[in-house]
Amino acid sequence: MNINAPPKRIGIMGGTFDPLHYGHLVAAEMARHEFALEKVIFIPTGNPPHKVGRRVTSPGDRYEMVKRAVQDNSFFEVSDLEIQRKGYSYTVDTLKELHELYPQHELYFITGADAFREIFTWREVQSVLSLSHFIGASRPGFDPLEFLEELKRDYPEFLPNMHLFDVPALAISSTDIRSRVKEGKPIRYLLPESVRLYIEKTGLYRI
């Protein structure tokens, strides 16, 4: 065993995934390649505190859709870690559990540019920043300068853990997909066919 070998890296992609679409998958695959991640674990949120008061599809259905979406990529996995947790799901708790499961690995949390900018509002933000690297999937029009200046001012020690990278611009959103289903419009080619068939079979988003 080479004791000087760098630690292996695991990508973490958390989200409501209501539903998961090609935008999520492209960002995960690009990050896996760009940051030499051993694998990417998709973790659907259980009871997300930021969605209080909003209608969210059941954890079981969201988990099943993610499972179907990632089954053809040997570098992708899905975890029910947050779904099984009672109460609200906080990123800090998830990262602590993952560190126990993968003590020899570095964690890389993959998120969109908008969520990347909101990290300072997360519960126990200092612990969150110390537990994982963060990868922000940038998009056209996103200006990271304000975020980076805030990071330099308040948490300069964590600046090396924050990474931005460009991903192909895909104008796809879960909100739009739900609206299209409700309006009877096609969603083919916006998300994996296995997910589309699951939505059709279960009648999700029709009302």
From Swiss-Prot:
InterPro entries cross-referenced by the UniProt entry: Cyt_trans-like, NadD/NMNAT, Rossmann-like_a/b/a_fold
Keyword Flavoprotein: no
Pfam families: CTP_transf_like (PF01467)
Keyword Nucleotidyltransferase belongs to the record: yes
Recorded metabolic or biological pathway in which this protein acts: Cofactor biosynthesis; NAD(+) biosynthesis; deamido-NAD(+) from nicotinate D-ribonucleotide: step 1/1
Broadest EC class assigned to this enzyme: transferase
Keywords: ATP-binding, NAD, Nucleotide-binding, Nucleotidyltransferase, Pyridine nucleotide biosynthesis, Transferase
Superkingdom of origin: Bacteria
UniProt cross-references to CDD domains, sorted A to Z: NMNAT
BP term (GO), one: NAD biosynthetic process
Entry's Gene Ontology molecular function annotations: ATP binding; nicotinate-nucleotide adenylyltransferase activity
Catalysis: reaction(s): nicotinate beta-D-ribonucleotide + ATP + H(+) = deamido-NAD(+) + diphosphate
Family: Belongs to the NadD family.
HAMAP family: NaMN_adenylyltr
NCBIfam families, alphabetized: cyt_tran_rel, nicotinate (nicotinamide) nucleotide adenylyltransferase, PRK00071.1-3
Primary role: Catalyzes the reversible adenylation of nicotinate mononucleotide (NaMN) to nicotinic acid adenine dinucleotide (NaAD).
Protein's name in the database: Probable nicotinate-nucleotide adenylyltransferase
Native species: Desulfitobacterium hafniense (strain Y51)
Phylogenetic placement of the source organism: Bacteria, Bacillati, Bacillota, Clostridia, Eubacteriales
Gene: nadD
